[in-house]
């Protein structure tokens, strides 16, 4: 019995292996958020990959692909910010759960737009939960808050240019 508990406990604390988003989905998301004709460069910051999006000499913003665990499966999403460190949008790239896919709907995602790192980004405060997708909505909200915080800090520290 102890062995089962130890194995189960290890599964809960093991780090989530990075789930890759299909490159075509990332490219389509960047185009939808920033328009056509953008240049996307990948920057390594603190062992993470950040996308720098520009058109010509103009910086349009930054984006990062992240993963959170929904009820049982990873949810892969892209968080994009503008040069003023405001959330441009959140785009769910891969949703693997059988239920709760409403986190990918624009009607839910649009409540993140324009928020800064100073916003609470908490279910029940400035973000609505989704009935039937409570775990997914909480997980994505937490992941967005963490990504926004990191992207903003890196940008303010000059690690993103």
Residue ranges and their predicted role:
Residues 9-18:
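Hydrophobic h-region of N-terminal signal peptides that target proteins for export
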Residues 1-7:
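Sec-dependent signal peptide recognition
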Residues 18-138, 142-161:
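Flexible, solvent-exposed loop/hinge segments and secondary-structure transition points
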């Amino acid at each position: 019995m102890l062995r089962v508990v130890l194995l189960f406990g290890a599964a809960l604390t093991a780090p989530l292996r990075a789930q890759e988003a299909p490159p075509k989905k990332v490219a389509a998301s960047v185009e939808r958020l920033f328009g056509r004709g953008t240049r996307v460069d990948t920057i390594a910051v603190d062992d993470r990959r950040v996308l720098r999006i520009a058109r010509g000499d103009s910086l349009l913003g930054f984006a990062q692909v992240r993963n959170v665990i929904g009820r049982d499966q990873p949810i892969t999403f892209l968080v994009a910010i503008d040069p003023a460190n405001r959330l441009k949008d959140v785009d769910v790239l891969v949703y693997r759960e059988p239920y709760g896919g409403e986190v990918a709907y624009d009607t839910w995602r649009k409540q993140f737009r324009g928020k800064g790192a100073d916003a609470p980004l908490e279910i029940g405060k400035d973000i609505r939960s989704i009935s039937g997708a409570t775990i997914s909505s909480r997980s994505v909200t937490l992941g967005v808050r963490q990504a926004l915080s990191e992207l903003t800090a890196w940008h303010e520290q000059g690690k993103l240019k």
